Amino acid sequence: DFIKGVSFPTNILYAGMLVSAGILYKDDALIKKSAILSERINEFSFDGKYYCDNAETEGGKLKPCRNHVSETCQYYALFFEIAKNRDFKERMANDFSLPQKDNPDGVVKSSVFIGNFLRIFWLLKEKRYEKILSETKDYFYDMSVQTGTLWEKAEPTASCNHGFASCM
C-alpha cells in the first residue's frame, strides 16, 4: 500500500509549498524549514537509485518501504527540486518516457494526472523542449485523432475529455 504511513510525495509537495511561501513572504524560516524537510526526504526516501513512495513506523523508527516505488514519486522529487543527483535526473529523462508500456526496474507506471504532467513540467524546467515535443506527440496524438480530445488515462476506459489535459 503506497500511501500507508508517511507519504513522501505529500511531504515533497509540502516542502515545495514552504519554499514558495517563504519566497513570496520573504520568510527565511519557511525556506529553512523546506530545506530541512528536503534533506530528510532525501535521507529516508532516496536509495541512490529511486525515491520510494512511503515509510512506516516500526519499533518507533521510520522504515522506508523500498518495494513501493512509483514513477510519479520520482517526478514529484524532480519537479519540486528535491532530487539533486545528476545521474538520477539523466536516468529519469532518458530511461523513462510517456508512451512506454513498462518502466525499468519494475517502477510502477504513472497515470496522466498527476505523474505524467509533472514529468512534462519538469522537462520544461530542464529546457528539454525536443523531448517534450516528441513524448507529447507520441502519448497524446492517437487520443486526439480518435476523439478530438485528451483523456484521463492512456486508454479510453475513463474520461475521454479530461479537463486537466487542457494544459497541454
Residue ranges and their predicted role:
Residues 1-168:
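Active-site core of glycosidic bond-cleaving carbohydrate-active enzymes
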